[in-house]
Amino acid sequence: MTADVLVRAAELESVWYSGRRAWHGPSGELVTGARIAAVLASAAATLRREGWAPGEFGLREVLAGDRDLFMVARQVLELVICARTGAGAAEPVLWDLVPGRTVGQVLELLADGAAYARRNGPASAQEVSA
C-alpha cells in the first residue's frame, strides 16, 4: 500500500460522489469508516483462515451479510482498485476472479481498503452533515 493510492482514492471519491454519499448503504443509513475497516479486516482474516478459492470462496462470500456493509465495502474497494489501475469503474467481486490473481493481491486490496476507510471514512453522522 502506498499513501499515493489512498490520496488518489480520496480524489476519486470526491469526483464520483457528491458529499459523502459513498458512506451510506442502500438503506440510506450511514456506515462509518471504522465499521468498514473492521469488515474488511474480518474478511481478510476469514480468507487467511478458510483459504481463497476464486469462484467458490472469495470477496463475494467473505463480504456477504449485511447489505449496507456489503455495498459500502464494495464502494471502498472499487475506489482503491480504480486508484491503482486508473480504471473509471471496477467491480471488486469480479476483480478477484481475474485469471492470475493471487491471494496476496486480494489480501492487499482488503488491507488497503481498510486503511482507506480508517483514514477517510466518517466517524459519525454529524461528520457527514458538516
Regions found by a protein language model. Give the residues of each.
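Short, flexible helical or helix-coil boundary motifs
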Residues: 13-19, 47-50, 66, 70, ...
